Each structure stands twice: as structure tokens, then as C-alpha cells.
């Protein structure tokens, strides 16, 4: 679906931007320069693009030309296939046929400022990030890398920033399950990883939460 077919997304961005005081990056359904303009006008600081960039790489340079490289994050979803790291889209469902090493070099060449590097194999498992993948991409590009997928403890977050050549880390399950729900018995290994995505099961362990409630939980 396009950005405008997603009911209330722009309003949600506006509301969120008013309630938080940290940089806001928005992704999902962004396919054109017009979509980028609408999201930034709604209050986002950056946009994150994946599928549209793979389908039409020149969109990267178009966005950079108008809004600058610091505004654009390119999401790169990766699955290891026969010992080769390959690029996927659609939450790890669509094989693009692109090698990660080739794609990240192209992303940098076209001017994007950051790469959100997701190991779909590790995502939601808490088994730690894929250091081999990170090293591969780091040796290919000089732009900022946000590592994502597999972070399972706060100690690992400390280690990432003190011992690895990475600029930022994206954390989801660790906050959702440990900080917000504090569920010691939740089997995180089956939520969010590749097998879970392909099974089409629902995330029964998650509950809806408002932005305000989330902020209050994080403060407590």
C-alpha cells in the first residue's frame, strides 16, 4: 500500500512528533519524493526506505538532492543463503537477487547517509548480532551503520558500542519484552525471526500501547 492508503499514518506521525523529544525516523510505504515530503512535513526527522530503493535506486539520489544525505536511511534486510549474504525485502520474504556487498556500495555511491542493517536470521532471537555480516558491510562502506537483529541483553548493547565499529543500534524485542512487559517466561526465540515471519502466526504476546503510556513506562 502507498503512504496515502494507510489510514491515519500522517496523523500518527504528527501526534508522535509532538509527544516525543528524540529524533523520529519513519519508514514503510515510502515510494516517492512526494511521500518523503509528506512525512518530513508531518514532523519526522528522517525517512527510512527499503523496497522502493531496491526497485528504483535513483530514488536515493533524488531524496538526497532535495533533503540531504542525513535525512535518508536505507534499510537493508539480509538473509544468509548458501554462505552468501543476500538482500531481501518485505520483512525477509522477497529475495532480490542482490548481494549485500554490491547493494551497500551502491547505496553509498548514491548518497544515502545511513544504513539500517538487519539480520533477518537473528531478528527477534536474542542470540546476538551477526558480527560477520557487520564486518562485511563495514569493509564495504564508510557511511553510518545502524546494526539491527539479535540484540538480547543490555550487556551486549554496551559491548556493541565499545568494541565494534558501528554507529548505532536498533533495539526492539529487548525493550518490548524486558522493559515494558518484564515477561521472564516469554519465548522470544520464536517471535520476529525468519521462521516466525514465514509461519504467518500472530504476535499474541504483544499488546497495543499508546505513545504516552510507552513514555510513562520507560520513565518508571
What are these regions (language model features)?
Residues 20-25, 30-47, 132-171:
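Catalytic cores of alpha/beta
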Residues 44-122:
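Conserved anion-binding
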Residues 54-56, 81, 153, 176-179:
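Short gly/pro/ser/thr-enriched loop/turn and capping motifs at secondary-structure boundaries
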Residues 28-29, 49-52, 96, 118, ...:
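Glycine- and other small-residue-rich loops at beta-strand/loop junctions that grip anionic moieties
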Residues 60-67, 159-220:
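C-terminal helical cap(s) of enzyme catalytic domains, especially alpha/beta-barrels
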Residues 1-6, 82, 95, 122-127, ...:
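Short, small-residue-enriched loops and turns at beta-alpha junctions
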Residues 3-25, 59-77, 126-153, 211, ...:
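Alpha-helix-loop-beta-strand connector modules within alpha/beta enzyme cores
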Residues 10, 33, 56-57, 97-101, ...:
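Structural motif corresponding to alpha-helix initiation and N-cap regions
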Amino acid at each position: 500500500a502507498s503512504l496515502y492508503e494507510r489510514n491515519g499514518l500522517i496523523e500518527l506521525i504528527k501526534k508522535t512528533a509532538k509527544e516525543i523529544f528524540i529524533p523520529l525516523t519513519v519508514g514503510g510505504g515510502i515510494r516517492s519524493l512526494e511521500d518523503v515530503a509528506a512525512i518530513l512535513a508531518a514532523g519526522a526527522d528522517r525517512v527510512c526506505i527499503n523496497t522502493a530503493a531496491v526497485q528504483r535506486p535513483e530514488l536515493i539520489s533524488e531524496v538526497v538532492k532535495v533533503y540531504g544525505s542525513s535525512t535518508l536511511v536505507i534499510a537493508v534486510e539480509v538473509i544468509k543463503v548458501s554462505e552468501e549474504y543476500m538482500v531481501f525485502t518485505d520483512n525477509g520474504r522477497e529475495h532480490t537477487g542482490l548481494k549485500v556487498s554490491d547493494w551497500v556500495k551502491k547505496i553509498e555511491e548514491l548518497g544515502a547517509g545511513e544504513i539500517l542493517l538487519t539480520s533477518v536470521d537473528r531478528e527477534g532471537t536474542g542470540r546476538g548480532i551477526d558480527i560477520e555480516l557487520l564486518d562485511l558491510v563495514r569493509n564495504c562502506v564508510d557511511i553510518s551503520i545502524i546494526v539491527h537483529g539479535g540484540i538480547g541483553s543490555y550487556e551486549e548493547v554496551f559491548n556493541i558500542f565499545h568494541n565494534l565499529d558501528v554507529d548505532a543500534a536498533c533495539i526492539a524485542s529487548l525493550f518490548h519484552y524486558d522493559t515494558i512487559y518484564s515477561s521472564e517466561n516469554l519465548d522470544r526465540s520464536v517471535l520476529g525471526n525468519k521462521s516466525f515471519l514465514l509461519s504467518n502466526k500472530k504476535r499474541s504476546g504483544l499488546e497495543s500501547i499508546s505513545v504516552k503510556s510507552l513514555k510513562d513506562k520507560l520513565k518508571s
